Amino acid sequence: MPPALYLSGPCEICEQPAHGNHFGVLSCRACAAFFRRAALQNAKYQDRVCRKGNCIGNDLYRCKICRLKKCCEVGMNSSKFQNDRDLISSSLRPTNYTKTSAPQSLANFLGRPEFILCCEPDKASSTKRLVDVTSLVDKAWAIFQEDAAYSWSPNHYPNSLEKLTFEMEEIKLKESSKKLEIATTIGRNEALLFLEQSFLGAAQWFARLPEFSMLDPQIKIDILKTSWMIWARLDKLAATADFHRQKLLGNDVYMWTDNTCMNPGNVKIDIKWSSNYSVEQLRGFLVPDIEKYWRHALSDLVELDPTNVELNFMLIQLCLNSAGQKYQGHVLEATEKILQIQSDNMHEYYTKKLKLVNYSGRLARLMKINRAIEADVRDRKEKNHIAKVFDLFFVEYSHPEMFEFS
């Protein structure tokens, strides 16, 4: 690299200290700026004549006409003007390509979201394979009919929330003797097992809520079909938090079914039974955003260590809000009534049993966990919609409303 060029001396136009070479001449900034303005095409001083004929040569206060003439005499050249140097104004000025199209990304170019960029349209399947889940719905009906005949004595429990909690504790106590297994592969059998255990587990939970048992049978099924997945999400996160608190599971291991856990980063996924695409092509669709939705909620559950009464209240809030938002009408009316009753029960539990007068801060943190789970389910709903539009899977269910989360 050549050494830096240092220029010094008087301005060749006004003889004031120069600041550098401007338009081919050693000049000050003032004369350079003057020439830049005056020498433009159609400038008002370009063709005028000095009134005096010519200003005194050594007069520092030349008229503008003579000053421009002096600039030209010493060698200033308008061909050395540089235009479009202003980055801000240049960026705001529309160009030919921005007028016709938006900036192209790979997702825009292919017309597919980023997490399915590798999908090939020729692998989309218009022929669907039906998975019949009618037997699960029939089993849920049977659970609701069986528990509807069960008599509840208010003398045994302070309120319906604590009744629900007590009965669910008894069920989990019976199942606690089962050996915990680690899932290394998730394929057709594992996916259907998760569906069966989660759907029927939610049905058993709902059946033990007295206010729910009084609802119309069709409303019960509608609520269950809408909320079983969101129920399973919180139920399994709460179970995972219990194991993490006891140091029985690693930080990256989560509960999958009632007695099965998995590490999402190590588990092998088999989707040959449901899609023509490979796991690598659909990994962004299949693997949940654990850092965004699961890990923070799990950390809060471990720290807060909610009681079983609090946990069941969180489940009620999640499930009934989800069902009410989707169905509106009679379903919304029924869910709002139950939510109001359970809110009163929760207030009574905090103030009378736990002796907490100011519990709003703790309850707000519990509801924050619920909002994170709701966001996760909304994200899954959007992905399911995209999967349907692009025919990513060739499997359909006999009751598709079970997989249309609110």
Swiss-Prot record:
Residues 8-83 bind DNA. Residues 150-406 form the NR LBD domain. One of its GO terms (cellular component) is nucleus. SUPFAM superfamilies: Glucocorticoid receptor-like (DNA-binding domain), Nuclear receptor ligand-binding domain. The keyword Zinc applies. InterPro entries: C.elegans_Orphan_NR (IPR051152), NHR-like_dom_sf (IPR035500), Nucl_hrmn_rcpt_lig-bd (IPR000536), Znf_hrmn_rcpt (IPR001628), Znf_NHR/GATA (IPR013088). It is found in: Nucleus. A zinc finger (NR C4-type) spans 11-31, 47-66. GO terms for molecular function: DNA-binding transcription factor activity; sequence-specific DNA binding; zinc ion binding. Orphan nuclear receptor. This is Nuclear hormone receptor family member nhr-133. It comes from Caenorhabditis elegans. The gene is nhr-133.
